[in-house]
Amino acid sequence: MAGTFTLRVVSPEGNVLKEEAEFVVLPGGNGEIGILPNHAPLISSIEIGVIRYTVNGKVEKIATSGGFVEVSDNKVTILADTAEPGEKVDLDRALAAKERAEKRLTQREGIDVRRAELALMRAVARINAARN
């Protein structure tokens, strides 16, 4: 198909997605990375956030806790630490996780601050993936 590329998302749990996509935006370490068909070869890390991709004009979202992306030969392969499609996110659980992390961060005593910050970032990514 003209104007598309193969997008594949893989996590330790297995294959999450394989689609012919028109566009993908990834959370990179220095900002978002946008990829269109026939993109130049690329290998990069990705951060905690939301992967947004377009298939048949419709934007879909996947929450990720980081990983790597490889782009070559009109194929985009994302090796994600975790990958949860937005429609599968339990929004109530994600909101509760966000609240717990925020509470931990306000107390700051007897906790691993970095761990609480990462938990908050993951919860926010899941919430953002679940919402339109």
Curated annotation (Swiss-Prot):
Q: Where in the cell is it found?
A: Cell membrane
Instruction: List keywords of the entry alphabetically.
Output: ATP synthesis, Cell membrane, CF(1), Hydrogen ion transport, Ion transport, Membrane, Transport
What cellular-component terms does GO give this entry?
A: plasma membrane; proton-transporting ATP synthase complex
* CDD domains from the UniProt entry: F1-ATPase_delta (cd12152)
Q: Which GO terms describe its molecular function?
A: ATP binding; proton-transporting ATP synthase activity, rotational mechanism
Would I find Transport among this entry's keywords?
yes
| SUPFAM superfamilies assigned to the protein according to its UniProt record, in alphabetical order | Epsilon subunit of F1F0-ATP synthase C-terminal domain (SSF46604), Epsilon subunit of F1F0-ATP synthase N-terminal domain (SSF51344)
Pfam families of this UniProt entry? ATP-synt_DE, ATP-synt_DE_N
**Entry superkingdom:** Bacteria
| Cited Gene3D superfamilies | ATP synthase delta/epsilon subunit, C-terminal domain, F0F1 ATP synthase delta/epsilon subunit, N-terminal
State if Transport is listed as a keyword. yes
| Membrane topology value | Peripheral membrane protein
Q: Per the similarity annotation, which family is this?
A: Belongs to the ATPase epsilon chain family.
The annotated subunit structure for this chain is: F-type ATPases have 2 components, CF(1) - the catalytic core - and CF(0) - the membrane proton channel. CF(1) has five subunits: alpha(3), beta(3), gamma(1), delta(1), epsilon(1). CF(0) has three main subunits: a, b and c.
Q: What does this protein do?
A: Produces ATP from ADP in the presence of a proton gradient across the membrane.
Protein name, per record: ATP synthase epsilon chain
Give the organism the record lists: Desulfitobacterium hafniense (strain Y51)
